[in-house]
Design a protein with these regions (language model features):
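Flexible, glycine/small-residue-enriched loop-and-beta-strand segment within the central core
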Residues: 1-66, 77, 82-83, 94
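Terminal amphipathic alpha-helical/low-complexity segments used for targeting or macromolecular assembly
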Residues: 16, 32, 52, 64, ...
Length: 115
């Protein structure tokens, strides 16, 4: 897991989270982007990961992101800042989008479907 928090920003990870291998969580773009007047237009922003979140293999969580409680970020996804995010969902893709709702996850391997 690679964490990059700079310029007074923070990465907050809630309780009972499961983080896979090769994850990158960043509050910064690493380099400044400026408009033609010379003003920086890409400030660093906090990252918040809720409680009971599972982040899959090779995923990237970018500045300004808030990953909601009880959610899953699919393998190799890029989670970016979003205004429409909901708990108990699976987010996947580049950029990550909601692909399933009304879910939760457990570390337990359940062998049979519960009816």
């Amino acid at each position: 897991i690679h964490l990059a928090a700079v310029e007074g920003t923070s990465i907050c990870i809630g309780s009972d989270c499961m983080l896979s291998h090769d994850i990158n969580i960043r509050t910064t773009d690493s380099h400044s982007i400026v408009n033609l007047k010379g003003d920086r237009i890409n400030p660093s922003q906090n990252v918040n990961i809720g409680n009971h979140v599972w982040i899959g293999l090779g995923s990237v969580v970018l500045k300004g992101s808030w990953v909601p409680d009880n959610s899953i970020v699919g393998a190799r996804s890029v989670f970016t800042a979003s205004k429409a995010i909901f708990s108990n969902c699976i987010y996947a893709g580049v950029p990550a989008k909601k692909v399933q709702d009304n879910i939760n996850w457990t570390r337990e391997r359940i062998k049979e479907k519960k009816i």
